[in-house]
Amino acid sequence: DLVRSRGLGDVYKRQGQLISHKANFDLTKVDLCVANELEERHEYNAWWYCCIPIAVVRPDNLPMPIFIRGDDIEYGLRNCKRLVTLNGICVWHEPFESKYSSSMYYYILRNQCIDNSMHCPGYDANALKADLRSQVMGEVNRYRYKNADLLIRGVRDFLKGIDWLEQTDAEALHKEIMAYGYKAQ
């Protein structure tokens, strides 16, 4: 199959939502191959899919220490202002959905909060509360109470600020988060 499951070059919206251009295009269809070549405005591309000028990669402009989910989003939004996508070039990897881990709930929401605070001027306390409420209730309704706790902890840790993030032993935190969540089966 030549179906593009995800478009390349995303538009970043409030609340950490990435809107992917040209997702699910069946590239065996001529009209979709032509449409795939149309230029679109995009603000982000995953760094594992980009050639970033070496002048950008400097000691004073490194990625934030928020590895696992969202680190490439923040770095891409900050540095990759002019993106060029080329038809036929792709990266094949396991879909994120099949890499389930409870710990991701912590990292995804915490890191979305960090990204939004830096790149979405309209992201305020009300938006944060709405995000948290929606995601926590979704997990509670599925009886995934540990995931709900991890979401709340992610927001609490975000609210501790940059000093806390810089001083935290990321490896120890990760071990703690991994030990708390549900184990994949």
Q: What are these model-derived regions, one by one?
A:
Residues R110-Q185:
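Terminal low-complexity segments of carbohydrate-biosynthetic enzymes
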Residues L86-S102:
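Active-site donor/metal-binding and catalytic loop motifs
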Residues D1-Y12:
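Single conserved hydrophobic/aromatic residue that forms the stacking wall/gate
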Residues D10-L32:
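Extended repeat-based solenoid scaffolds, especially LRR ectodomains
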Residues N45-Y49, I54, P59-L77, R82-V91:
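Donor nucleotide-sugar recognition loop
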Residues F25-C50:
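A recurrent flexible, glycine/aromatic-enriched loop bordering the glycosyltransferase active site
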Residues R78, C90, S98, C113-I114:
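Gly/lys/ser-thr-rich phosphate-binding loops in alpha/beta enzymes
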